[in-house]
Amino acid sequence: SKDRIQNDIEAFNAFNATPGHGITRLTWTPEYISAYRYVINELKQIGAEVTICRAGCIRGRFPGDDPSSPAVMSGSHIDTVLNGGPFDGVVGTITALEAARVVVENDIPHRHPIDVVVFPEEEGSGFGMVLGGSSLWTGGIDPEEIDRLANVEGLTFDEAMRSAGVTVENDSILRAGDIKAMLEVHIEQSVVLDRENISIGIIESIAGLKWCDLVIEGIANHAGGTPMTYRRDALQGAVRIIAGLCGEICELRQQTARLRGENAIDPDLPVNR
């Protein structure tokens, strides 16, 4: 029902570390755990068999007439970027939950198991690995890869998960043969549907991310006494690189994009860099 969906959205938005400044809910933080437990509780209320799977992924299963057959899966993530929006990930989680409620309430028969799932650390804002939870569950990466990373408190993914009181109950890898179909409902992450007055779209491809850390070294010298012709200003070089990349990428295909996410200047003082 619309009322339940609205209540779910409001509940999720209350689990937020930055009220008034967007939604911040990083993996295994107190806000995240509150949302995590909310999902588990709602699934249990409608009779789901809830299992904490590899990487802390939630799976709420409704067995169906043939419990051994591949599952029809739906869900998303509940972690956010810093100061993010109220719907990213939440929409996919809530729609899967609400669909399961409707199936249960109306006693709709289904042959295949229905799985409502939640993947941790999909945004990568907590531990720096995008699609971390789903990649771990499906065997795309080894646990050692994500455990080389740490959150702002210095905890690895596994340490933070255990500190939050989450215990994996099924550490097996999710295989392609385990899934009949997967559906994730998602918000429009651009303006295309709105501008084109289209109500819904189906994804045909997704951005392939490539992260690069660039270190530009200059020479520090007296800010007032050093002529411009003798300066090697690292920040000025960085600005040229950023502008140059923007120009190059704008000439490529329409779907290509670039983002400069973070800058750090050392020393961050009013001197030549």
What is each model feature region?
Residues 40-44, 53, 58-154, 158-160, ...:
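Active-site metal-coordination/substrate-binding segment of hydrolases
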Residues 19-29, 46, 220-226:
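Glycine-rich, flexible beta-strand/loop modules in the N-terminal catalytic cores of phosphate-handling
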Residues 121-122, 128-273:
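Midchain, well-structured core segments that form catalytic/ion-binding scaffolds
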Residues 1-29, 120:
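N-terminal capping segment at the start of a domain
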Residues 4, 8-11, 15, 38, ...:
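Generic non-transmembrane alpha-helical segments
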